[in-house]
């Protein structure tokens, strides 16, 4: 019954998309695997496996070949009790804890940094995969704005507008994009259009739960991302480029010093 309601909602969303905006049939892809471990029993999020099938649906819409699940490194942490247990303290939920499964694509190196809600001062290092025994295993939880840089040198960049449902989805994109900008519409006061323009982002994807996709309040927050004012991101890019040049110069100086010491 509930699935039928969701299908009707998704159909309405798909019908009203503008040309050039592509619909990812996540529900259709997940329905093919309904008997697998797609949702936590004690939490409101999808699992790493459920998010993988969401990623497969995205790849089909984007014309990308998904990385086979069989080629990824699987890590598992047992004993996870999520929000449903935290809110109810129900013993039957406690007696059936979840397991957190992460699937790590092969051969990908990443660097993740996050910024506060209002500006680009004081960036903090983070990780794509965190050693957490809960849903924070994916991109270390929620932050207003995260930038992930990979060793995939294809020049492709993507921005992901998300709530916490998108965390487990983002981790699979590292195989396909050189840069990934992760924006949490609930917390970020950054101007997304300015960031996309300054960073020359190619793709934009919305990774949110059904309730967020149809809620007037959350739609308003996502719309605000286009109008909010913040520090120009191009200044951050200039600072990063200057730092790369400085690192390169220091690397050359270190090499020269080593050669001189040898003689």
Model-inferred region functions:
Residues 1-263:
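Extracellular glycan-modifying ectodomains
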């Amino acid at each position: 019954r509930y699935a039928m309601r969701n299908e009707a909602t998704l159909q309405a969303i798909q019908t009203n998309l503008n040309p050039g905006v592509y619909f990812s049939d996540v529900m259709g892809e997940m329905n093919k695997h309904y008997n697998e471990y797609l949702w936590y029993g004690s939490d409101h999020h999808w699992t790493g496996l459920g998010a993988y099938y969401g990623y497969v649906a995205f790849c089909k819409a984007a014309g990308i070949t998904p990385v086979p699940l069989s080629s990824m490194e699987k890590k598992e942490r047992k004993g996870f009790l999520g929000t449903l247990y935290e809110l109810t303290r129900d013993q039957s939920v406690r007696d059936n804890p979840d397991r957190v499964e992460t699937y790590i694509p092969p051969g990908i190196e990443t660097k993740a940094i996050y910024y506060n809600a209002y500006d680009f001062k004081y960036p903090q290092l983070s990780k794509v995969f965190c050693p957490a025994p809960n849903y924070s295993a994916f991109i270390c939880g929620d932050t207003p704005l995260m930038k992930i840089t990979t060793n995939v040198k294809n020049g492709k960049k993507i921005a992901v507008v998300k709530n916490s449902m998108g965390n487990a989805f983002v981790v699979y994109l590292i195989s396909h994009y050189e840069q990934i900008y992760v924006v949490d519409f609930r917390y970020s006061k950054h101007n997304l259009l300015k960031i996309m323009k300054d960073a020359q982002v190619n793709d934009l994807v919305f990774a949110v739960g059904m309730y967020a996709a149809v809620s007037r309040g959350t739609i308003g927050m996502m719309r605000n991302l286009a109008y909010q004012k913040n520090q120009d991101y191009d200044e951050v890019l200039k600072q990063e480029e200057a730092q790369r040049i400085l690192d390169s110069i220091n690397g050359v100086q270190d090499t020269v010093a080593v050669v001189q010491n040898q003689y």
